[in-house]
Amino acid sequence: MEKIKKFTDIVDIKNKRVLLRSDFNVPVFKEEIHDKTRIDVSIPFIQNLLKKKAKVILISHLGRPKSEKDMNLSLKPIFKYLQEKIDHKIHFYSHKITNNTKEKISFLKSGEIIFFENIRFNVGEIKNDENFAKNLSSVA
C-alpha cells in the first residue's frame, strides 16, 4: 500500500495554487476579533507557503449564516487582520464560487494570497453540493 504524502514531503510548490481551508471561526463582534488564537496559529504555515512562492487560495467559514450575505459573519475583519500580520499581497474575493471562479482569480501571482469570503455564504457548501465541490476544487 502506498504511503500518503504529508504536505511537508512536497518540496516544490513554486507557482502552484494551494487551496488551504483554515479554521478562522473566531468570535467577532462589531468587526472586532475577540480571540485571535486560531488565526495566529495558522500564520506560520501560510507564511511558509508564501516563502515557497505558492499561490495561496485561503478559505474559511465564520458561524452559521442565516442568509447568503449575513455581513455580521463576514470574514472581512479577519482579512484586515491578516493584512496587518502577513507582509505579502492579500486579495479579498467577495463573490460566490462558480464554474468561472478560476478565471476570475487567474491574476493571482506567486507569493500572493486570495482570501475568499465566508465559504458558508455559498449555499452549496451547506448542502454538500457536488457541483459546488467541483467548482471549489477547480480553483486549485
Residue ranges and their predicted role:
Residues 1-140:
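Active-site loop-to-helix "anion-binding N-cap" substructures in soluble metabolic enzymes
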